[in-house]
Amino acid sequence: MNYSAGLTPQNFDELADWLLTVSSQFSPAELHGAIIGALSGTMRLSDEKWAQFGLAVMGAPIETMQQFGDLAASVLGSLAREQLAVLIDDDLAFQPFLPDDDETIEDRTDALSQWCRGFLGGFAEAQAYLQKQPSQEQAAANTPSFSETVQEAISDLSAIAQAVVEDEGCPVDDYDDDRDIGDAPLAIESFLNEDGEAFEQEAGDAQAAEKNYMEIIEYLRLATMTIFTEYGWIEIHHQQESSPAALSAQSGNPNGTLH
């Protein structure tokens, strides 16, 4: 698919198509993660600034920026707005852009790690952006404080970012469906192999790896929504300060926070 202004990628494959349109081999998962990380870090930009952000994340040369700047503004600006709406919505419908299940577990886990790396990079870029506000006082006023829950969620995403597919055996009992984000660190080791050498998995191992992968994606979803709710939903933080009564009348606090 060749993307034109007015179209917004809705999943991994469509974002991959857009990247091909702008002659980029960059990871769709990492780009989506970077946008979500920036939003979760309280970054709110114009379409043109989202284009600059996305093209910078992609490491696009100046020629790409000149040729595709308007298209990037349309596509990445609308993508950021749509994803912000999804994160704010209390339907908990947020999903990271990752490959379909017909891709190998190795490719999907690699994309999962790329998504988390993108998120962490985007989140860090948002913090740097806030510090460039006209004054330190304004920057401090615009920045919520990190809760322990947010710090631990970011730490877990950092661990997932380093994950590689386990090639031999894949424990499935390390994940607790009732686990709070503030509990002991996520057992990412279930994806790790001592030497990282790939070989053909037995059927049971493949099924275990698949189950573990899906569980970690669900944890990733909840961790991301927790970070956004407790830190990145800057609009609600400001409204809490200015009009608690108006806030209480809203239905909008997303319930993605883990307690």
Language-model region placement:
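Domain-length accessory/inserted modules outside core catalytic folds
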Residues: 1-116, 120-259
